[in-house]
């Protein structure tokens, strides 16, 4: 599960702890801060939510401030994943070279398709960064492409491919079934 945050960061730790209490220890729990924290808020959140045993924290700081992302990554015990900070191959290189994140979230629709995503994932692999393939709100056909891409890359260990769920008028609805 991946609860989303971004507004009212002072309340996020309590919400994450409530989710953990509701689902128990058997469920992996991640948190997407949606660029909503400054460094101090992020550090307070990590300490307050420590007992929730989060697996990953996604994009805790604003995309416009990559150095903040690096400071948070260096200061906390949890893997920090860049999402909004990764749009181009140059972003991947900057994140990897600067040690600004532990992981990257590659979204095919955001980065410009499979060819660009392959290069980004290769940069991440060379730098020792794990990858997740994520998605935007997109049709099931795009999700199927993301899944095929994720399964074809050796350093993609996570997928968050639910952007088609609840999409109204999806012309490719039913094109794939996950079991």
Sequence positions of predicted segments:
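Oxidoreductase and adenylate-handling cofactor-binding alpha/beta cores
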Residues: 148-154
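Catalytic core of soluble alpha/beta enzymes
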Residues: 3-142, 169-178
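Short helix/strand-capping turn motifs
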Residues: 154-159, 163
